[in-house]
Every structure is written in structure tokens, then in C-alpha cells.
Amino acid sequence: AQVYPFVTLAKKDKDLRQMLVGAINRQTACILIDPYANGFNEGPTGSEWESDRTEMKKELHERKWEIDSLCYPIRLAYHYWKEVGDTSVFDSKWEQAMEAVYRTFREQQRKDSLGPYRFSRVTDRQGDTLLNDGWGSPVNPVGLIVSSFRPSDDATLFGFLVPSNLFAI
């Protein structure tokens, strides 16, 4: 989201294009590490949140599932392509990442099961953890995507975060 405003300037600035390609490629790599994560390290360095009850990996800083974390990379890549005409970012890794995005969105519609994502944290802040043994509040599967956390990193009480679902379409 932070570099998105620069996209309109990229056509005239080679260094800016290179920076945007790097950001898109980094976001692609992050999605491939874990599409449910919202914060990543530069490498496998671990995190202060390693004790969270979820599938943490050393490359992750935090694993709070938000729909927006998968929408912003798509928006950036799409508008970069529309502005510059460069398709180099749409390689096989990008394709794999988009398959992971699609799979994650389908899993979090929770039509067949709760999906693989759970999260709980030992904390005195209710907004930092999910209810129901890490699954979040129950939902009736209607086709919307469950977002366990809001873009502000606080837990959703009602999993169908409508603005984020609109962003996803």
C-alpha cells in the first residue's frame, strides 16, 4: 500500500520501476512463504511472536490472517502493468502465488470446513487473539471470505469483513 502512489510515476523513472518490480517480487515471495501471514522478516530470523499458537515459520514476523494482505500485492502488480506495460513480474512464481491466493480465499469461505488457519496468542488484549480455540467467531458459509483480523491487526468479532471482501473482488 505504501508504494502504490508511485505507480503513476514509474513510466518515466527507471529506478522507480526497478523499486516497484522489487516490491512486487518480494510480495510474491512472501505469499509463497505463507499466504496467511501479515508480517515477514528479511530471512529466517524468527520473531517475538514465535510462541503464537499458529503455524509460525522463521521467515514470519506475525501470522494474523487479513484479506487485505493478499489484495494489496495484486493491486500493485496490476496497476504497475497497466501503467508501465511491463509483464516481467507475471512469471511462474507469480502464478504460484496467485494460485495460493485463490486457494486461501476459497478455504476461508469455509464452505466445506473451517480451513487450515487458526490463531491464538496468550495476551490480556482480546483484540490480539481469536475466540473459539483460535478459529474466531462461527460464521454461516454464504460465499464471503472470513478475515480473522482487520487491516489494523485487531481480531474481527464478525469474520465477514465487508470492505475487505469488496477489495477481494
What is each of the regions a protein language model found here?
Residues 158-169:
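A conserved active-site cap/scaffold subdomain adjacent to cofactor or substrate pockets
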Residues 13, 93, 149, 153, ...:
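Solvent-exposed, flexible loop/coil residues
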Residues 3-20, 24-123:
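Aromatic-rich carbohydrate-recognition surfaces in CAZymes
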Residues 25, 38-41, 132, 140, ...:
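Detector for Asparagine
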Residues 46-64, 126-160:
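Acidic/His metal-coordination segments adjacent to aromatic residues that form catalytic metal sites
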